[in-house]
């Protein structure tokens, strides 16, 4: 499957980096950097994911949120857990249905999973994969976006999205290459909100002013270093 292909690609990239120690390498990876020249990055947007969870937790009337993911790997798991923690902050009674479709792109399968969750009572969907928001539109429920902004394609459905800005990571790496300071490092922190690597977008017309204000207050605390979002890379599961 795709995960094994990716692992094979990474092994090859690490071997090439070892063969060319004077060339800078930067790769998206859940694993560690290797001196002197192999650096890694990842989509550490758990902070805006937490904030989007606050939006969802306040929005659900059934207290059941559906979550459809691709693969249960660290960079997906941590965003889901952060989202769940944010939802629980504003709604301690909220429960979750979680499913992974074991594919990066299979909209029909994601849509089918989302429909099953809605049939079980979920009235807000976490759209980690394409297809979930389409299901939400058909059933008239709200959705939360992830990584990229697709709200323009689903007006009135996507309440908020946790957005990844990879440019912050790339810019830092390129600047270090340019000034000769590049070395093996983990560039994960440059996906944090404080570095401009992650952000939250909200459609405030789809939520109460109280919810929007609470989310903005928490966001300010994150940016000021007064609130830290927990990181949990373990596979999330449905509530019993």
Name each model-derived stretch:
Residues 51-94, 98, 186-207:
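An alpha-beta-alpha
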Residues 3-4:
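Short, small-residue-biased leader/transition segments that mark boundaries at the very start
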Residues 148, 153-196, 200:
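Flexible loop/turn connectors
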Residues 33-58, 67-72, 155-168:
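Short beta-strand elements at the ligand-binding edges of bilobed clamshell
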Residues 178-240:
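Hinge/cleft segment of the Venus flytrap/periplasmic-binding protein
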Residues 102-118:
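Structural motif
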Residues 18-43, 147-157:
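Flexible loop/hinge segments that line or gate small-molecule binding clefts
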Residues 113-162:
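Pocket-lining segment of extracytoplasmic ligand-binding domains
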């Amino acid at each position: 499957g795709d995960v094994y292909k990716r692992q094979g690609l990474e092994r090859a990239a690490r071997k090439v980096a070892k063969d060319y120690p004077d060339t800078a390498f930067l790769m998206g990876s859940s694993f560690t950097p290797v001196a002197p020249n192999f650096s890694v990055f990842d989509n550490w947007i758990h902070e805006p994911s937490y904030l989007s969870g606050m939006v969802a937790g306040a929005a659900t009337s059934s207290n059941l949120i559906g979550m459809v993911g691709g693969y249960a790997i660290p960079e997906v798991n941590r965003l889901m857990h952060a989202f769940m923690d944010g939802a629980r902050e504003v709604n301690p009674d909220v429960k979750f249905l979680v499913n992974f479709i074991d594919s990066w792109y299979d909209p029909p399968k994601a849509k089918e999973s989302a429909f099953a969750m809605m049939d079980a009572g979920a009235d807000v969907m976490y759209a980690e994969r394409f297809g979930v928001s389409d299901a939400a539109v058909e059933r008239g429920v709200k959705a939360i976006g992830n990584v990229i902004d697709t709200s323009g394609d689903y007006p009135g459905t996507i309440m908020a999205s946790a957005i990844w800005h990879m440019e912050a990571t790339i810019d830092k790496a390129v600047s270090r290459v340019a000034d000769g300071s590049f070395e093996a490092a983990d560039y994960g922190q440059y996906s944090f909100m404080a570095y401009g690597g992650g952000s939250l977008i909200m459609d405030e017309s789809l939520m109460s002013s109280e919810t929007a204000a609470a989310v903005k207050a928490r966001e300010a605390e994150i940016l000021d270093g007064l609130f830290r979002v927990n990181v949990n890379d373990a596979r999330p599961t449905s509530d019993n």
